[in-house]
Swiss-Prot record:
InterPro entries: NDUB1. The chain crosses the membrane at residues 10-26. Keywords: Electron transport, Membrane, Mitochondrion, Mitochondrion inner membrane, Respiratory chain, Transmembrane, Transmembrane helix, Transport. It comes from the Eukaryota. It is a single-pass membrane protein. Complex I is composed of 45 different subunits. One of its GO terms (cellular component) is respiratory chain complex I. This is NADH dehydrogenase [ubiquinone] 1 beta subcomplex subunit 1. Pfam families: NADH_oxidored (PF08040). Accessory subunit of the mitochondrial membrane respiratory chain NADH dehydrogenase (Complex I) that is believed not to be involved in catalysis. Complex I functions in the transfer of electrons from NADH to the respiratory chain. The immediate electron acceptor for the enzyme is believed to be ubiquinone. It is found in: Mitochondrion inner membrane. Its main location: mitochondrion. Belongs to the complex I NDUFB1 subunit family.
Length: 57
């Protein structure tokens, strides 16, 4: 019964950080997908000039 009371009182302290970590993971996976597309895109496929930064970070 005591464990059930602790879970009932503190569930938000577990779910909020888990949601943050899950969102961070999904954001990283989406960035990987967009980076893979950038490398195949004709717009960004050209050779960069010397000392030129990438156009899409």
């Amino acid at each position: 019964m005591n464990l059930l009371q602790v879970v009932r009182d503190h569930w938000v302290h577990v779910l909020v950080p888990m949601g943050f970590v899950f969102g961070y993971y999904l954001d990283r996976k989406n960035d990987e997908k967009l980076t893979a597309f950038r490398n195949k895109s004709l717009l960004y496929k050209r050779e960069l000039k010397p000392n030129e930064e990438v156009t899409w970070k």
